[in-house]
């Protein structure tokens, strides 16, 4: 699909462990979309937010994790990780957020 895009010169596909790739990048971003291993969401967030300009956005997918994060007792490592991520973002004074309850949950996070 990159080859079909009129922006193909601006696109670059990076594959591998994002916890190793992100620190090696020199760019800053206006929009970031996270849909990756749930256990590492907090790591990604902590690496990305400092490199984002004020007013930029981070979108985190699957933040309801099949509704499991709404249960009284969290089961499974992914549900626990997403619940921890949601609490982590909510407590971060650097950002504002809203959780959209579409499909499996999408959190829209804006850096102040």
PLM features: residue spans?
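S-adenosylmethionine/decaboxylated-SAM
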Residues: 1-112
């Amino acid at each position: 699909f990159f080859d079909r895009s009129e922006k193909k010169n601006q696109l670059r596909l990076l594959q591998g462990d994002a916890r190793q790739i992100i620190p090696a990048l020199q760019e800053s971003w206006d929009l970031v979309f996270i849909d990756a291993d749930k256990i590492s969401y907090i790591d990604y967030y902590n690496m990305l937010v400092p490199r984002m300009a004020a007013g930029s956005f981070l979108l985190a997918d699957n933040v309801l994790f099949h509704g499991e994060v709404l249960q009284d007792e969290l089961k499974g490592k992914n549900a626990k990780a997403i619940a921890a991520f949601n609490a982590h973002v909510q407590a971060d004074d650097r950002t504002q957020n809203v959780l959209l309850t579409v499909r499996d949950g999408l959190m829209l996070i804006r850096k102040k």
